[in-house]
C-alpha cells in the first residue's frame, strides 16, 4: 500500500497537534504554586471549615504584622503588696485588641483561644535602668473571653522595686515627654504558638 506524501504529512501534523493539545490541557497539574500564609485567624478558620487545609498551623520566623495591638500605650502600675506572694509582685494587665473575635470564633466556649509567651523588655541602648539582660518578666497566656482580651505579666519583687524607683524618678524628672529617647521605657515582646 502506497501512502501519498501529502497524506503522511497531514497525519504527522495531526499527531503533533494532538500531542501539544494534550500537553497544554494537562499543564495545570504540572504548575507549582506557592502556598502563602496570611497572618489572619479568620482566614485560616474559614479555610478549615470549607474542608481545605486542616491540621495544626505551624508558623516560624518573625511575623511582619502582629494580629494584636495594645489598647493603650499607658499601663497602670499597681505596686500594692497585699494579696501577692513574697516572690511575685502585682500583675501588670495589658489590654489587647485585634487578637480575634473571642466567642464569635468558638460559640459557647470560654477559655484560651490563642496561646502566647512573651515578656516586657526595656528599650534599646546599653544604659538600661531596669535590667541588664533586658527581660523584665514572663507573661502568662493570652486569654480571650468573648472578645475581652488581656495578657498578664508578673514581675518578681526585685523587678517591681526597680519599676517603682524608675516611676518615681521619671515623674520627678519629667521623662514621660519623649518615650523614644528614654531607654527605660517598656516594650512588649510576644511569641505566637
Swiss-Prot record:
Q: Where in the cell is it found?
A: Periplasm
Report what the protein is called.
Protein PrsJ
Record Pfam families: PapJ
User: What does this chain do?
Assistant: This protein maintains pilus integrity and thus is an important participant in pilus assembly. It may function as molecular chaperone directly or indirectly in the correct assembly of PapA subunits.
* Transmembrane segment boundaries: none
Query: Which terms are listed as keywords in the entry?
Result: Chaperone, Periplasm, Signal
> What cellular component terms from Gene Ontology apply here?
periplasmic space
Look up the domain of life of the source: Bacteria
Q: Which residue positions does the secretion signal occupy?
A: 1-27
Chief localisation class: periplasm
> What is the native source organism of this protein?
Escherichia coli
Read off the InterPro entries from this record: PapJ
